[in-house]
Amino acid sequence: MTAAGDRPVLTDGRLRIRPGQPGDAARLRAILAEPSVSRWWAEPDPVEVIEEELRGDDSAVLLVVEIDGQVAGGIQYNEENDPMYRHAGIDIYLGGRFQGRGAGTEAVRLLARFLFEQRGHHRITIDPAAANEPAIRCYTKVGFRPVGVMRQYERGPDGTFHDGLLMDLLRDELPPSPRKRRRG
């Protein structure tokens, strides 16, 4: 587990990933309740639970995604720190008005770069619902590859089990940020 003091602040242009602040939990819960998000996530946790996650009282590190200074969603990671494995997992959600504009792709890319370069991981996994095509496109743009379908992986909001798609990205597969590429 990463201590709350170790939580990064990552920025790239208009996008910022930062530790949570008082008041963020209510906004994140509202985003999780939006139809475009709740379709893929379980019932939102109470504000108190989200506050605990933002403080670091959980095994996952939950961070806030801001776009142009507005809370757009959450991104979290968990780490396997055993040197024999040294990998991390990521999850992300963005409010409906921030979806489909490249923000998710950039947030995942930014966090992946941090996990590889600053935390020393060699592999990152992400596990969207197999039917969540927009998320899969987003992760593919970052460089993630499908490695298998996990049948009846998680219970959806409708109460039935749904397949998950396991995707991973190795350290040397992360392409440079589009802003950093040289023309020529």
Annotated model-derived regions:
Residues 1-51, 172-184:
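A short, well-structured alpha-helix characteristic of acyl/acetyltransferase catalytic modules
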Residues 15, 70-74, 162:
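Glycine-rich phosphate/pyrophosphate-binding loop shared by adenosine-nucleotide-utilizing enzymes
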Residues 39-99, 114, 170-174, 178-184:
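Acetyl-CoA-dependent GNAT
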Residues 100-114, 136-141:
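Conserved acetyl-CoA-binding loop-helix of GNAT-fold acetyltransferases
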Residues 104, 108, 132-135, 152-157:
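Short glycine/proline-centered loop/turn elements that form peptide/ligand docking sites
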Residues 117-127:
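Conserved GNAT acetyl-CoA-binding A-motif
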Residues 125-128, 145-162:
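Conserved catalytic-core motifs of GNAT/GCN5-like acyltransferases
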Residues 139, 144, 167:
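Conserved active-site tyrosine of GNAT-family acetyltransferases
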